Amino acid sequence: MVRIIVKNVSKVFKKGKVVALDNVNINIENGERFGILGPSGAGKTTFMRIIAGLDVPSTGELYFDDRLVASNGKLIVPPEDRKIGMVFQTWALYPNLTAFENIAFPLTNMKMSKEEIRKRVEEVAKILDIHHVLNHFPRELSGGQQQRVALARALVKDPSLLLLDEPFSNLDARMRDSARALVKEVQSRLGVTLLVVSHDPADIFAIADRVGVLVKGKLVQVGKPEDLYDNPVSIQVASLIGEINELEGKVTNEGVVIGSLRFPVSVSSDRAIIGIRPEDVKLSKDVIKDDSWILVGKGKVKVIGYQGGLFRITITPLDSEEEIFTYSDHPIHSGEEVLVYVRKDKIKVFEKN
């Protein structure tokens, strides 16, 4: 285990014209599972490379526990001395080596006997349930088995920190849940500090105890997954984390008005953006007698589609072209007027810049 301290780290390229990281500060605790979430170009890979020692911060400092490992453009502790294991997006297995040889590769430059190497490889392979494929080449393995070999190779030197870079993007959807569960189980068993980087919130939320959101090189929010989902600092963060309706409205004494809809919230600016997740919207032809739901007005069904056992229904408020979508277990015909309800404690309000 190791504690990672990132202090005022910035990274610029092309003589300062491209800012990849902008004054990032993070503390990752011993044994913590920490996730970095962000869109393409947010600086996630640059952040990972600085942690790994493959790049250095232009300004700022990086500590492993109390040890300064990089500072202001200088590499103080090289990658091989940081006790890091990495799993890349492509897994990067050597096609001409068996699974055993791939896993053992990081040990070849260490002063270990063949018996010690064999014992360590088999120990890690057993944890990951791949001991029966150690003599197979990567081309003979399934995608899930290849990923386990890559994970075993990262763990074979008993690292203090495990870095995962978009680790599940090459797996098909049906295998991802089990792969995420495996990573979490192995981390808990070994107690290694874990940093996972991904653009997919499902990857991050399934593994991480805390999450940092990177947008255009800035760390804009850090918190538990459920806190980020329910209380995002911006509509951009909200949309990164999950599906959300984004509605721009006018602020009045009655709240935020969007056509025929009125959201009873307080905002200091003249215009505001309402964010409401599809599961927090309910459409009905009848009055709903449930205090957790509030009526915000009427809308007209514009589009209805069927996906995954549910109907995806898109409506427009009367007198507005804004669109709101939600999911329902029963269809509502296009063109019908409906009452629009929302969960009153789930309305998200963002000031319009």
Curated annotation (Swiss-Prot):
GO terms for molecular function: ABC-type ferric iron transporter activity; ATP binding; ATP hydrolysis activity. Changing residue 142 to A: Decrease in ATPase activity. Can form dimers. Gene3D superfamilies: 2.40.50.100, Nucleic acid-binding proteins (2.40.50.140), P-loop containing nucleotide triphosphate hydrolases (3.40.50.300). Its main location: membrane. It is a peripheral membrane protein. Part of the ABC transporter complex GlcSTUV involved in glucose uptake. Responsible for energy coupling to the transport system. In vitro, as a free subunit, exhibits a constitutive ATPase activity. The complex is composed of two ATP-binding proteins (GlcV), two transmembrane proteins (GlcT and GlcU) and a solute-binding protein (GlcS). Forms transient head-to-tail homodimers in the presence of ATP-Mg(2+). This is Glucose import ATP-binding protein GlcV. It comes from Saccharolobus solfataricus (strain ATCC 35092 / DSM 1617 / JCM 11322 / P2) (Sulfolobus solfataricus). The gene is glcV.
